[in-house]
């Protein structure tokens, strides 16, 4: 019986594992890749996607300005042609299935969350492929900027794409996010929430539900076992009157035999 209960306890744990494996978009899309640079350095990012033999889809580099929207920094106009906006450059190769973004002469004001992905002008929507957290630190005052050793790139991770609404630098209309929200490190919005905290809360709630389900299953099986034991005891007790009647009959016959022997 104990082994049976332990097997039931494993069911919610297996469900949690399957949810994390089968639905990476739910858990993984809120995780950001943190990249560190110093003032004056450059940043290069590559975003990969599945090549498609359809009409060309624009690609963009988008900076988060609030938990519910982002502003496009630089956007492609056609394949295999570099597009430049200030210190930002983007270049796309649809046949290879990737596009590169370069940011030069970084300043501390460039510290923010950035998204890269396909851009759909009619919907004003970006399908986010990567979520980059850029942290630009001041250069050491004792060393010239050209002697600063470049910091290593973060390991590239492909996330489950999810769409968000966006605005261009000229547009000021507020747009709501259509997917999972992300915070902007440089944003002063009081409603901002850490993605890591949101993930922890989601995991905690899911594990709490799994634990409650486990307790319910154990109690249900325990009550069922108690019911079966009660029925078995009732059946055994119901047989006792027949046994007592049999004993009375045997006792009665023995009495007659004793009287016969006496006569």
Swiss-Prot record:
Residues 29-200 are extracellular. Disruption phenotype: No visible phenotype. Mutant mice are born at the expected Mendelian frequency and are fertile and healthy. In response to CpG DNA, a TLR9 ligand, levels of TNF and IL12B but not IFNB1 and CXCL10 are severely reduced. Disulfide bonds join 47-116. Glycans are attached at residue 100. Residues 222-263 are cytoplasmic. One of its GO terms (biological process) is innate immune response. The keyword Endoplasmic reticulum does not apply. PROSITE patterns: IG_LIKE. Residues 1-28 form the signal peptide. Residues 168-191 are annotated as: Disordered. Induction: Induced by synthetic TLR7 ligand gardiquimod (GRD) in cultured splenic macrophages. The keyword Glycoprotein applies. It is found in: Cell membrane. One of its GO terms (cellular component) is plasma membrane. Predominantly expressed in spleen, with highest levels on selected populations of macrophages, including red pulp macrophages, and on subsets of dendritic cells (DC), mostly on CD8alpha(+) DC (at protein level). Also expressed on blood and spleen Ly6C(low) monocytes (at protein level). Not expressed on lymphocytes or granulocytes (at protein level). Keywords: Antiviral defense, Cell membrane, Disulfide bond, Glycoprotein, Immunity, Immunoglobulin domain, Innate immunity, Membrane, Receptor, Signal, Transmembrane, Transmembrane helix. Residues 29-132 form the Ig-like V-type domain. The chain crosses the membrane at residues 201-221. It holds the Pfam family V-set. It is a single-pass type I membrane protein. Its main location: membrane. Positively regulates Toll-like receptor signaling via TLR7, TLR9 and TLR13 in neutrophils and splenic macrophages. Regulates TLR7 signaling by controlling ligand-induced recruitment of TLR7 from the endoplasmic reticulum to endosomes and lysosomes. Positively regulates Toll-like receptor TLR9-induced production of inflammatory cytokines but is dispensable for IFNB1 production. Involved in the anti-viral response to several viruses including influenza virus, vesicular stomatitis virus and cytomegalovirus. The cytoplasmic tail appears to be dispensable for TLR7-mediated signaling. Interacts with TYROBP/DAP12. This is Trem-like transcript 4 protein. It comes from Mus musculus (Mouse). The gene is Treml4.
């Amino acid at each position: 019986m104990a082994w049976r209960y332990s097997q039931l306890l494993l069911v919610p744990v297996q469900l949690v594992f399957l949810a994390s494996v089968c639905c990476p978009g739910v858990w993984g899309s809120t995780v950001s890749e943190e990249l560190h640079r110093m003032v004056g350095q450059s940043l290069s990012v590559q975003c990969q996607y599945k090549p498609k033999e359809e009409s060309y889809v624009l690609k963009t580099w988008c900076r988060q300005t609030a938990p519910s929207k982002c502003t496009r920094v630089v956007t492609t106009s056609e394949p295999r042609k570099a597009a430049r906006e200030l210190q930002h450059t983007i270049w796309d190769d649809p046949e290879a299935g990737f596009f590169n973004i370069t940011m030069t002469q970084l300043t501390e004001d460039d510290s923010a969350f950035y998204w890269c992905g396909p851009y759909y002008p009619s919907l004003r929507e970006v399908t986010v492929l990567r979520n980059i957290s850029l942290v630009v630190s001041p250069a050491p005052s004792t060393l010239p900027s050209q002697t600063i050793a470049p910091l290593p790139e973060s390991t590239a991770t492909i996330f489950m794409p999810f769409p968000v609404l966006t605005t261009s630098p000229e547009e000021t209309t507020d747009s709501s996010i259509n997917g999972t929200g992300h915070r902007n490190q440089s944003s002063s919005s009081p409603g901002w929430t850490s993605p890591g905290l949101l993930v922890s809360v989601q995991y905690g709630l899911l594990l709490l539900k799994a634990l409650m389900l486990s307790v319910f299953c154990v109690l249900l099986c325990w009550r069922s076992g108690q019911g079966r034991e009660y029925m078995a005891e009732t059946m055994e007790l119901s047989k006792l009157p027949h046994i007592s009647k049999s004993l009375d009959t045997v006792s009665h016959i023995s009495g007659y035999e004793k009287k016969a022997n006496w006569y």
